[in-house]
UniProtKB/Swiss-Prot annotation:
Organism ancestry: Bacteria, Pseudomonadati, Pseudomonadota, Gammaproteobacteria, Thiotrichales
Protein known as: Large ribosomal subunit protein uL11
A Pfam match: Ribosomal_L11_N
The organism of origin for this protein: Hydrogenovibrio crunogenus (strain DSM 25203 / XCL-2)
Keyword list, A-Z: Methylation, Ribonucleoprotein, Ribosomal protein, RNA-binding, rRNA-binding
Biological processes, Gene Ontology terms: translation
PANTHER family, per database record: 60S RIBOSOMAL PROTEIN L12 (PTHR11661), LARGE RIBOSOMAL SUBUNIT PROTEIN UL11M (PTHR11661:SF1)
Amino acid sequence: MAKKIEAYIKLQVPAGNANPSPPVGPALGQHGVNIMEFCKAFNAQTQSMEKNLPVPVVITVFNDRSFTFITKTPPASVLLKKAAGIQKGSGVPNMDKVGTVTRAQLEEIANTKMADLNANDLDAAVKIIAGSARSMGLNVEG
């Protein structure tokens, strides 16, 4: 008989740096999942990524307390802030511009995010990322 799904848990965990402290511990603990087993598996899977880059993860918990997880690509906003060299986006994006990103940087981010974006080709993905950049108060060049 197939395992019955008990819950889906969505978290953002720093790449290669999952530990039992919040938010990971409480979220997994309330479903009875072995927290250290998840932390070891997650850290092993994300060791090739840049350290401490937040990685969205969807954990599927089954009724026998086993689990599987899927890692996604880092959020576009984090990648854009890193590319522009800023700490945070603008509070008033249409008035205050806090940085600039080039077309090449947008293409690089779109390539990274392509698996998680709802786009058919790279050009459409670049437009999605450019829209995110504008809504953060970044100027888009090119």
